[in-house]
Design a protein with these regions (language model features):
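Phosphate/anion-contacting hairpin/loop surfaces
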Residues: 70-170, 176-177, 181-183, 191
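A cross-family signal for N-terminal binding/gating loops and helix N-caps
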Residues: 1-115
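Short coil/turn linker and secondary-structure boundary residues
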Residues: 2, 36-37, 48, 140-143, ...
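Short, intrinsically disordered, charge-balanced linker/junction segments flanking boundaries
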Residues: 190-196
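Alpha-helical architecture
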Residues: 56, 171-172
Length: 196
């Protein structure tokens, strides 16, 4: 599953193709991925300008002019590719195309269909059910030793389990938690509250 660093790389890679661009069309080739697409997904995005791409944990955000926000999760095998010029015919696992008036296509491919796309608004983004319980983002300027220490205080669970809990630290998965603990010389079985 793509973890926070990979999702941030995807966000940065898609910026030139999407930011500041108007979506000429949005093509959805199946009714659902992990969850059904909102019934008005295509209508609300088509003709709207992508003001900026954001990210929180493993979620990508397409902030649209007018206040809509598309929430995208890549799931286990999902990826997004920017195609300039005429896009090739979609393959079996190419589920969504975002086509801009500038002629670019951003294609979402997901073999296992564990990804998701949904909509919310700027006003409701922080309280959206997928976002509201996510912990601090380790790439945010506000993240610090003190923030992590406070999140681990009193936690009797293992440090590995605590770091994998998205309410403790957002966006970390098994790869980065295991590597970080190994490089720090901290046993993954050590109680979280003992790490200061």
């Amino acid at each position: 599953m793509p973890e926070l660093p990979e999702v941030e790389t995807v966000r940065r890679g898609l910026q030139p193709a999407l930011e500041g661009q108007t979506l000429k069309s949005v093509i959805v080739r199946r009714a659902k991925l992990r969850i059904p697409f909102p019934k008005d997904f295509v209508r609300r995005l088509t003709g709207s300008k992508v003001e900026r791409l954001g990210r929180r944990a493993k979620y990508l955000f397409m902030h649209m002019q007018g206040g809509d926000v598309a929430i995208i999760h890549l799931g286990m095998t999902g990826h997004m590719t920017a195609i300039s010029g005429k896009a090739p015919a979609p393959g079996k696992h190419d589920h969504v195309d975002f086509c801009t008036t500038a002629g670019a296509t951003v294609r979402f491919n997901d073999v296992r269909r564990f990804g998701l796309m949904t909509l919310t608004t700027e006003e409701e983004l922080e309280t959206h059910r997928l976002i509201k319980n996510i912990g601090p983002d380790p790439l945010a300027n506000s993240f610090s030793h003190e923030v992590l220490s406070a999140a681990l205080k009193g936690r009797a669970t293992s440090i590995k389990a605590a770091l994998l809990d998205q309410k403790t630290v957002a966006g970390l998965g098994n790869i980065y938690v295991s590597e970080s603990l190994f490089r720090s010389g901290i046993s993954p079985k050590r109680q979280a509250k003992s790490v200061q």
